[in-house]
Amino acid sequence: MRHYEIMIILDPAQDERTVAPSLDKYLDVVRKEKGNVDKVDIWGKRRLAYPIQKKEEGIYVVVDFTCESATVLEVDRLLNLNDSVLRTKVLRTDA
C-alpha cells in the first residue's frame, strides 16, 4: 500500500459544517478496501488563483490516506462525478 494526499476544492455555496459528513461517503471507499484515512484537514473558504467554473472562491480540503492505487482511482472518479467538487488533485507522497 502507498501513501497518498488528495486536495479537493469544493463549491463555496456549500455550508462548511457539511463538508466533513459529505466527504465521509467517499472516504468509506478507502476504508472498505482495507485502506487507512490518516488525516482530513479542512482549510475552509479561500480565494482561487483563477476562476474555476465561474467561481472565485472554493472550500479547500486536504486528505492524507494509505491504500492501493486502484482505490485512489475510484475515489478520484467518484469525487469528479459530484457537482459540488470543483477540482481534485491526487499526489503520491513518500511517507
Curated annotation (Swiss-Prot):
InterPro entries the UniProt entry points to: Ribosomal_bS6, Ribosomal_bS6_sf, Ribosomal_S6_plastid/chlpt, Transl_elong_EF1B/ribsomal_bS6
UniProt-listed NCBIfam families: S6
Function of the protein: Binds together with bS18 to 16S ribosomal RNA.
Family: Belongs to the bacterial ribosomal protein bS6 family.
GO BP: any one term: translation
Gene Ontology CC terms, in alphabetical order: cytoplasm; ribonucleoprotein complex; ribosome
One Pfam family of this chain: Ribosomal_S6
Keywords from the named record: Ribonucleoprotein, Ribosomal protein, RNA-binding, rRNA-binding
Superkingdom: Bacteria
GO molecular function term, any single one: structural constituent of ribosome
Protein's name in the database: Small ribosomal subunit protein bS6
Gene3D superfamilies: 3.30.70.60
